Regions:
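Mixed-charge (Asp/Glu-Lys/Arg
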Residues: 1-35, 41-151
Length: 151
């Protein structure tokens, strides 16, 4: 059975909130769904806007969409819209690694796809490589209900 994207996003937000709270952050939710961010975090000194994203492990890296897609709307002004200048962090949950990664937007100035390396690249490239372990704030294993029942 194919999972509804909203359900997948809710599971990601839950994993992120658990990891943030365990890491010592205060977590608040904005009212409504018309903000460009999903959460607000409080580190005791300042507040920051966080966009939650589901990452997928592909070719040794956790990859996520670093933009919103509007192509499914009737007459979108733009098919994609990035988050640069509108959030402070991406919080990425990857079910395959159970990792939650908090990535400052200035470390992910990308318009479409974000990426964190889980394994070093085979060509030994070091420049412009972001290692997942440097951004990991916790591990949370949240499986879909049908996976828990079947397993």
């Amino acid at each position: 059975m194919i999972e509804h994207p909203k359900t997948k996003g809710d599971r990601t937000a839950l994993a992120v909130m658990i990891a943030l709270q365990d890491a010592g952050f205060g977590v608040a939710l904005p009212f409504g769904e018309n903000t460009r961010y999903d959460l607000v975090i409080d580190d005791g000194r300042s507040l920051a806007r966080v966009q939650c994203k589901t990452g997928r492990l592909r070719e040794g890296a956790v990859r996520w969409n670093a933009c919103s897609n509007y192509a499914h709307h009737a007459n979108p002004r733009m098919a994609q819209r990035d988050y640069i200048g509108e959030i402070d962090y991406f919080a990425v949950y990857c079910p395959e690694t159970s990792g939650v990664y908090l990535v400052p937007i200035q470390h992910a100035q990308v318009r479409t796809k974000g990426s964190l390396r889980v394994h070093p690249p085979r060509n030994n490239q070091r420049r412009l490589i972001r290692l997942a372990r440097e951004y990991e704030i916790g591990r949370v294993d949240i499986q879909p209900l049908n996976a828990r029942v079947a397993g």
